[in-house]
Amino acid sequence: MNIEDVVLKYALANAVKYGGRADVKAVMAKIMAEVPDLRPRAREVRQLVEAVVAKVNSMQPEEQLRLLRERWPEALEERRVEQRRPGIESLPELPNVRGGVVVRFAPNPDFVLHLGSARPAILNYAYRMRYGGRFILRFEDTDPRTKRPLVSDEVNAYEAIREDLRWLGVRWDEEHIQSRRMEIYYDHARMLLSMGAAYVDLCRPEEWRRLRNAGRACPHRGQSPEEALELWDRMLRGDFGEGEAVVRIKTDLSHPDPSVRDWVAFRVIDTSKTPHPLTGDRYVVWPTYNFAVSIDDHLMGVTHVLRAQEHSVNTVKQSYVFKHFGWEQPVTIHFGRLRIEGASLSKSKLKALRVRYDDVSLPTLAGLRSRGILPEAIWELILTVGIKPSDTTVALSNLFALNRKRVEPAANRYMFVTEPVKLVFESDRELVAKIPLHPSYRERGERVYKLGPGRVEVYVSSRDVRPGAVVRLMELANVEVLEVGGGAARGRLHSLELEAARRVGAPIVQWVADPVEVRVVKPVAVGKKVEEVGLGERALEAVEEGAYLQFFRYGFVKKVGRLDFVYVHD
C-alpha cells in the first residue's frame, strides 16, 4: 500500500468514526503508530494528511462510509475484543433478525447522559453484541432554539456523551451528527414536495390548530409541487420569519391522534439570535425530530429501534415518511420509562440544580462515575430491568447493592472517626491491635498498633462514648467510660477479651491513634452534598488514589486526593 492509500484509509476511518469529520492530529497519530517507518518523513506525511483530510471532510458521510467499505472493509472491524456480558442472553429475542442487526443510540446533546439514558445505550449495544452488526451513535441536534446543544466552557455535551459511552464500555461502529447532514434533509424535503407528499403551510398557528382539530385540510394543502418548491426555496433564502412558514408531511386528517395529522417536518429558526454551536447561523430552516430520524434510519440501514414508550406516537408519525418513499420501516420495540426512586432524571430539573454535571450528588453518568459507581453495576441493573413495556421504578439502593458486591472484595478496611474526642485511659501492659486489611483476605496483611503501657490516648466518635458505658475498641481492649466533656473523655481499662465485651453488651467502636485529618464528600440528596471532616489512620496516606476502601461502620469510600475521599454508599 502506498503512502497516499495509507493516509486515505486512516482519514476515512477517523471520519466515519467521528460523524464525518476527520482530525489531522488523530490521523497523524494513527499513521505514526501503525507505520513507524514513516516517522522520519513526518513533515512530508503531515502535509499529505492535511490535504487528504480536507478532501475527506468535503465528502458526505455516506460517501466516506461507502469508500471505506469498498477499499478497506477490515478498518470497520478494527475494534477491541468485546467481552460477553452476563445477562445479555437473557434478553428476549428480537423479531426479524436477518444476520446481524443495525441499531442506534441517538442522544440529544442538550445535556449529558444520566442513568435513564444508559438504558437505550446499553440495550441497543447488548443486541449488537448478541447478534453482530453495527451500532450507530447519532447526535440528534436539529433544534438550536428550544433544545440547544450544550457547548460551553464547562462542558461540551458531544464529547461528554462520547466519554460516558466509553466509560460504560459501549463502542460505536460509526458516528453521525445531524446538524452536519442538513443538505441531505433538504434533498429529501425537495423530493417529498415534488411528489406532492408534503406542502408549505403559511397558516397562522392558531388557524392551523383549529383546522387540524376539526379534521379539515389547510388551504395550502392543495398547492401544486411547483408552488410548494417555490415556497421552499423562499424558506431557504430566509424570506420567512419564525412561525410564518412550515413544511408539513401529508398524513391522515382523520387520524384519532390530532398530533399525527399533517405534522411539521421543517420550521424556521432564527439562528442569528440562537446560533447552533456547530453550524452557527448558516441554516435557518431546520428539520424536526421525526423527519430527520426517518431519513437517517433509512439511509443508515437501521434494522431495529429500541426506545422509550413515550416515542410510540413518533413511530406512527415516522411511518408516513417511510410510506411516501416506499421504504421499509425498522422494527420498533418500545420499553417503559425507568424511574429512580427519590431522584429525578428530568434534564430540565437536573440543569436547574446549577451544579457541575459530574457532581457526585447527581444521577448523571459522569456524577455516578465521580462517586465511584462501576459501569458493570449499571449494566447489571439495566439488563435486569430489560425491555419491559411497563414503567419500572428502582431505588438507588438497588444500584448500590450491585456496586457493593463488586467493590467489597477489593476494598481494604480502615478506621475513620467523625466528631472525634480524645479518650484517655491507663494500661498496666502493652496493648496490641492487629487489624487485617480485609477480613476475608488475610493474605493481604495487617496493620499492627502497640499502645502503652502507661497512658493510652486514642480518638473515638463522641457518639460512641457516654459515662458509665463500656466500649470495645476494635481489636484492642474494652474500656469503661468514666466521664465525657470538653472534647475529651476519660476511662479505665475494663478487660481485654472480646468475650468480656459481649457479656456486658459493649458495642464495638472504631478508634484512631496517631491520626491524620480526613475529608469525605458525602452525597445526601440529588444536587446536595456535605463534607465530613474526621480523623483517620495515618496509613491512609499511602493508599493509591482511586482505590476503594471501607471505613468501618461508615461505608465504602473512594480516594480522590491525598486525604480526600468520596462516599460511595454504605
Curated annotation (Swiss-Prot):
**Subcellular locations according to the entry:** Cytoplasm
Which terms are listed as keywords in the entry? Aminoacyl-tRNA synthetase, ATP-binding, Cytoplasm, Ligase, Nucleotide-binding, Protein biosynthesis
Homology family: Belongs to the class-I aminoacyl-tRNA synthetase family. Glutamate--tRNA ligase type 2 subfamily.
Which NCBIfam families does the record associate with it? gltX_arch, PRK04156.1
Q: Kindly give the PANTHER family that the UniProt entry links to this protein.
A: GLUTAMATE--TRNA LIGASE (PTHR43097:SF5), GLUTAMINE-TRNA LIGASE (PTHR43097)
Its recorded reaction(s) are:
tRNA(Glu) + L-glutamate + ATP = L-glutamyl-tRNA(Glu) + AMP + diphosphate
Spell out the InterPro entries in the cross-references: Gln/Glu-tRNA_Ligase (IPR050132), Glu-tRNA-synth_arc/euk (IPR004526), Glu/Gln-tRNA-synth (IPR000924), Glu/Gln-tRNA-synth_Ib_cat-dom (IPR020058), Glu/Gln-tRNA-synth_Ib_codon-bd (IPR020059), Rbsml_bL25/Gln-tRNA_synth_N (IPR020056), Ribosomal_bL25/Gln-tRNA_synth (IPR011035), Rossmann-like_a/b/a_fold (IPR014729)
Q: What is its EC number?
A: 6.1.1.17
Its lineage opens with: Archaea, Thermoproteota, Thermoprotei, Thermoproteales, Thermoproteaceae
Q: Does the keyword Mitochondrion apply?
A: no
Name the job this protein performs: Catalyzes the attachment of glutamate to tRNA(Glu) in a two-step reaction: glutamate is first activated by ATP to form Glu-AMP and then transferred to the acceptor end of tRNA(Glu).
What's the protein name?
A: Glutamate--tRNA ligase
State the superkingdom. Archaea
Q: What GO annotations for molecular function exist for this entry?
A: ATP binding; glutamate-tRNA ligase activity
Q: What is the organism of origin for this protein?
A: Pyrobaculum neutrophilum (strain DSM 2338 / JCM 9278 / NBRC 100436 / V24Sta)
